[in-house]
C-alpha cells in the first residue's frame, strides 16, 4: 500500500501520513492486488459472514485484504459497522417506474449513516500512528460518526460545525458521544480550509474526506452490495453528492472488484446533487474543466449543503471510468421522494432521498431506460433530521404530495370505525 498524489503522481508510504502533496493535490491509496485470487477471496468473505465477536464481523473489516491489509488487528477500532440492509419495495419501484430497484440502507449503521464505513478505517489508521486527538468539520453525519469511534477508541474528538443550516439532531448526537463541539461562523468549506492549515500544528488527525483512508473504508459499501447480490451488480448505482467522498469510494471499489475479476462489468454511476448546492453537477452539465465553488450553497438536505466539495477531482475520474452521469433535484423533489422511502418502512434523512428523486428524474428524462436495473444508496437515518419530518407532514407546504397528518379524534367505537 502506498499514497499517490492524484495531481503529480508523487508517492509516499502510508505510515508517513499527509493529506496533501507538496504540489497541493490530494493523495489516493494504491493497493497491490496481484497476489489475490478471486475465488479464494469470495470463499474467505463468505466464511466471515458467520463471525460474531471478532473485527471480521464488521461489514468493513470483512474485506480487510482489500482495504488495509497492513493494519495490525489490535489497532482496529470497530463497532461492527456495515452489514446494512439491501431492500426492494413496490412503492419505490412504482414511484420511479424502473424494472428493478434496490435500496442500500446505510442508515442502519451504528451512528446512523454511511460515514461509519470510512470512519472505522480512518480512526484505526490514526490509532496505529499514535494519535489521540481526532477532528473534522461537518454538517452532521461525519461529526457523529467520528465522535462515536473516538469514544470507542478512548480518544478525544474536536468537531467544527457551521452555526446555521444544519440538523441539530446530528449535533446533539455528536455532543452525546462526548465530543468537543465548536459552532463556527461560515460554512463546511471554511472549516475544511481551517483544518488544512492548522491541524498538523494542533496535533489533530483529520477525518474528513480529504483523508484517503476514509475512502478506503467506504469502498466496502460496494463490496458488500456485490457479495449480497452474488457478485452480479445492477446497471446503475445512484449516490447523493455532497463532499463527493462516497461517489469516489464507490467508483474506486468498483474498479477493485473489476480488476480482481470479482465482477465482470462496471455499473454506471449517477451522482445526484441538490439544486441549491450543485457545483459538481453544473461543472459536468456545462462540460467545464474545473469546478466553480458556490460560496453560499443552500438546500434543505443539510448533508448536501456543500459548495466546494473536496473530492470533486476524484469523483470526476469516477464518472469517466464508469461512463457516469449527474443530475440535480429540487428540495421538494427530495422531500417527496423521502416520503415514499419512509412510507415503504425503510426511511431515510433528506440527503439520502436525493438518490430516489434523481433516479426518477433521469428515468422521466429517458436518460435511464425503464428496462434497466438500479441501486440507490440511502446514506442517513430517518431520525437524523426530525425537523424535516415536521415541516413536511405538519407544515402548510401544498406541494408535499404524500403528507400524512396527525388526526385528533374522540375515543369511541363509531368514530374509529369510520376511519378504519
Predicted segments — roles?
Residues 1-420:
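PLP-dependent amino-acid enzyme catalytic core
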Amino acid at each position: 500500500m502506498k499514497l499517490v498524489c492524484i495531481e503529480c503522481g508523487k508517492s509516499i508510504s502510508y505510515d508517513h501520513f499527509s493529506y496533501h502533496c507538496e504540489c497541493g493535490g490530494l493523495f489516493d491509496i494504491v493497493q497491490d492486488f496481484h497476489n489475490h485470487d478471486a475465488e479464494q477471496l469470495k470463499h474467505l468473505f463468505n466464511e466471515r459472514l458467520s463471525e460474531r465477536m471478532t473485527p471480521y464481523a464488521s461489514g468493513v473489516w470483512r474485506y480487510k485484504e482489500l482495504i488495509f491489509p497492513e493494519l495490525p488487528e489490535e489497532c482496529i477500532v470497530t463497532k461492527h459497522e456495515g452489514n446494512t440492509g439491501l431492500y426492494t419495495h413496490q412503492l419505490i419501484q412504482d414511484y420511479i417506474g424502473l424494472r428493478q430497484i434496490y435500496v442500500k440502507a446505510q442508515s442502519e449503521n451504528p451512528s446512523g449513516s454511511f460515514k461509519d464505513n470510512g470512519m472505522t478505517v480512518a480512526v484505526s489508521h490514526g490509532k496505529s500512528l499514535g494519535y489521540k486527538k481526532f477532528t473534522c468539520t461537518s454538517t452532521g453525519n461525519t461529526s457523529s460518526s467520528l465522535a462515536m469511534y473516538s469514544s470507542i477508541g478512548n480518544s478525544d474528538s474536536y468537531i467544527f460545525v457551521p452555526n446555521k443550516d444544519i440538523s441539530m439532531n446530528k449535533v446533539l448526537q455528536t455532543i452525546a458521544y462526548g465530543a468537543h463541539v465548536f459552532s463556527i461562523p461560515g460554512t463546511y468549506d471554511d472549516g475544511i480550509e481551517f483544518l488544512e492549515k492548522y491541524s498538523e500544528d494542533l496535533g489533530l488527525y483529520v477525518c474528513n474526506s480529504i483523508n484517503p483512508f476514509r475512502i478506503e473504508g467506504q469502498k466496502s459499501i460496494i463490496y458488500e452490495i456485490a457479495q449480497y447480490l452474488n457478485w452480479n451488480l445492477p446497471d446503475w448505482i445512484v449516490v447523493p453528492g455532497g463532499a463527493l467522498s462516497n461517489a469516489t469510494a464507490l467508483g474506486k471499489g468498483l474498479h477493485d472488484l473489476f480488476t480482481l475479476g470479482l465482477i465482470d462489468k462496471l455499473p454506471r454511476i449517477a451522482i445526484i446533487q441538490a439544486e441549491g448546492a450543485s457545483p459538481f453537477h453544473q461543472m459536468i452539465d456545462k462540460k467545464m474543466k474545473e469546478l466553480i465553488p458556490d460560496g453560499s450553497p443552500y438546500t434543505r438536505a443539510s448533508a448536501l449543503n456543500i459548495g466546494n466539495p473536496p473530492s470533486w477531482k476524484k469523483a470526476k475520474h469516477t464518472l469517466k471510468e464508469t461512463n457516469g452521469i449527474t443530475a440535480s433535484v429540487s428540495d421538494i423533489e427530495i422531500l417527496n421522494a423521502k416520503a415514499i422511502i419512509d412510507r415503504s418502512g425503510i426511511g431515510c434523512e433528506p440527503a439520502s432521498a436525493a438518490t430516489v428523486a434523481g433516479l426518477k428524474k433521469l428515468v422521466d428524462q429517458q436518460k435511464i431506460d425503464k428496462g434497466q436495473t438500479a441501486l440507490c444508496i440511502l446514506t442517513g437515518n430517518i431520525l437524523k433530521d426530525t425537523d424535516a419530518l415536521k415541516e413536511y407532514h405538519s407544515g402548510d407546504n401544498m406541494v408535499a404530495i404524500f403528507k400524512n397528518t396527525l388526526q385528533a379524534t374522540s375515543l369511541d367505537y363509531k368514530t374509529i370505525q369510520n376511519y378504519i
